[in-house]
Every structure is written in C-alpha cells, then in structure tokens.
C-alpha cells in the first residue's frame, strides 16, 4: 500500500497554502482578520501565493505577544493580556527576573468554553534596580512593566588622542 507524503513547502493546487500544518499552529480564541475571509490563493491565480498566517503583519497588540524595550532612561515590557482581568494577573520580581503569570479558569465565550494560562519571564538589566520596577494595566489590555535605569555617575569627559611614531605591531623575527 502506497502512502502519500505531503511536504508543507511544496504548493499543491487543491490544498490551501495558508492552512495550518499542525494543530498548535492555529490561533484558538482569537478574532479573524479580514485576510482570513479572502478566497484561497489557488482560486485567485495559479501564480499568486498569499503569505501564510504567521507572516501577517498585524500590530504587536493583535498578536498576543510582548515587547521589551531598553531605552536610554528606562527599561519597559509591554505585554498583551487582553483576555485577563487584573485579578487574574500576578507580577513578581525574583532577584533579577520579572515573572508575569496570568490564569483564568474555564469560562464560556461565543465559541464554546475556554481557559487560559501563561508564564513569562524577563531578565532585569544590571543597571535597573529591581525595587523601582512598577506595573500598570491599560484599559485596552496592555500590561506595562517598567523601571528607571541608573544614570552613569560623573560628567562626560573627552579623552585626547596622542600620536606615536613607532608601530603598535612589530614584525616577528624570521628563522
């Protein structure tokens, strides 16, 4: 008995290119984007390939991901937690690690029942005092964790460059 082997990188005319190849590649509980409602690539043109869903370019907020920034004067983390209430979130600092945990029990939504849980850890930069870290939750579900960076002590000083007449590297003696 022959078994057909389907390679995900080979385009097949009767198989939509954008379909998830594994169960975990699907976006459960997330809203549809407008591009999800377009016809499949093979019905448009045999030469047109719509990019797969993981290559879409929505804003970071729509993806459920986090963004960590290290700016001149502060360290910050923005994390999309729109599916969690403030009571379902915990932010802790353990040594030089920030831990964010969110969990809600099973509840019913328009698609059925769903429960969610996540753990995220971020290393605090060496120039940020863990005791100064704060967090806030915006009305649109973005958790912001930030802390000020320590300023370098002392004024800036320009160091003059002197020129020497001898080379820095000397040739090795030949044998």
UniProtKB/Swiss-Prot annotation:
What's a single GO CC term here? extracellular region
Could you tell me which residue ranges the sHSP domain spans? Answer: 56-164
Q: Which residues carry this modification: Phosphoserine?
A: 19, 45, 59
Q: Which GO terms describe its molecular function?
A: metal ion binding; protein homodimerization activity; structural constituent of eye lens; unfolded protein binding
Gene3D superfamilies xref list: 2.60.40.790
Instruction: Give the location in the cell.
Output: Cytoplasm; Nucleus; Secreted; Lysosome
UniProt modified residues of type N-acetylmethionine? 1
BP-aspect Gene Ontology terms = negative regulation of apoptotic process; negative regulation of DNA-templated transcription; protein refolding; response to heat
Keywords assigned by UniProt, alphabetized:
Acetylation, Chaperone, Cytoplasm, Eye lens protein, Glycoprotein, Lysosome, Metal-binding, Methylation, Nucleus, Phosphoprotein, Secreted, Zinc
Detail which positions bind Zn(2+) 1. Answer: 83, 111, 119
- According to the UniProt record, where is the region Disordered? 142-175
Binding annotation for Zn(2+) 2: 104, 106
What the entry lists under InterPro entries is as follows: A-crystallin/Hsp20_dom, ACD_alphaB-crystallin, Alpha-crystallin/HSP_16, Alpha-crystallin/sHSP_animal, Alpha-crystallin_N, HSP20-like_chaperone
The entry's family comment says: Belongs to the small heat shock protein (HSP20) family.
Write out the function statement from the record. Answer: May contribute to the transparency and refractive index of the lens. Has chaperone-like activity, preventing aggregation of various proteins under a wide range of stress conditions. In lens epithelial cells, stabilizes the ATP6V1A protein, preventing its degradation by the proteasome.
Quaternary structure, per UniProt, is: Heteromer composed of three CRYAA and one CRYAB subunits. Aggregates with homologous proteins, including the small heat shock protein HSPB1, to form large heteromeric complexes. Inter-subunit bridging via zinc ions enhances stability, which is crucial as there is no protein turn over in the lens. Interacts with HSPBAP1 and TTN/titin. Interacts with TMEM109; in the cellular response to DNA damage. Interacts with DES; binds rapidly during early stages of DES filament assembly and a reduced binding seen in the later stages.
According to UniProt, the name of this protein is Alpha-crystallin B chain
The organism's taxonomy opens as:
Eukaryota, Metazoa, Chordata, Craniata, Vertebrata
Q: What would be the name of the gene that encodes this protein? A: CRYAB
């Amino acid at each position: 008995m022959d078994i057909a082997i389907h390679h995900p990188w080979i385009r097949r005319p009767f198989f939509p290119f954008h379909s998830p190849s594994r169960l975990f590649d699907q976006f459960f509980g997330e809203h549809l984007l407008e591009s999800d409602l377009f016809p499949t690539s093979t019905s448009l043109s045999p030469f047109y390939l719509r990019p797969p869903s993981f290559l879409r370019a929505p804003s970071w907020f729509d993806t459920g991901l986090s963004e960590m920034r290290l700016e001149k004067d502060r360290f910050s983390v923005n994390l999309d937690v729109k599916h969690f209430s403030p009571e379902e979130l915990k932010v802790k600092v353990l040594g030089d690690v920030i831990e964010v945990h969110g969990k809600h029990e099973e509840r019913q939504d328009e698609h059925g029942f769903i429960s969610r849980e996540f753990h995220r850890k971020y290393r605090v930069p060496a120039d940020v005092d863990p005791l100064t870290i704060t967090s806030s939750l915006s009305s649109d579900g973005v958790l912001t964790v930030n802390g000020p960076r320590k300023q370098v002590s002392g004024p800036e000083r320009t160091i003059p460059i002197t020129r020497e007449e001898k080379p820095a590297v000397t040739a090795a003696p030949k044998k």
